[in-house]
């Protein structure tokens, strides 16, 4: 009725992570968890409800505030000299500020009548690393040489919702 745009954030959990290469917007989805299934169901419901939608799939979001990997690593480092971090899951860490800038650019484009912005996008920063590589880089950049980041497997770090191995 008001011609609004539906803006939605989704996740890499809509994929099973079995691919050895990065996923694109056209890659087939195959969620490996209930969480991923719910996110995919949300995407599908939005796309069915209106053509005037923007869905941004993001992954590995981090920032200096809130609950995220960066903050968790800093907190864990304060408690000891060794941190165990998964090394066999690959992805693209995404700075929350950059995602906000992408969102802003899309909203501004839509406000100017750019209807080409509707659809599904993957919104992540460039590059690929493992959680272990990400943690190692964090401590290298802040100069915490005394922190040891030990590589472990996904099986050694179980989670309630299985993460895609490559996203």
Language model feature labels by segment:
Residues 5, 14-56, 60-61:
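Catalytic helix-loop patch of NAD(P)-dependent Rossmann-fold dehydrogenases
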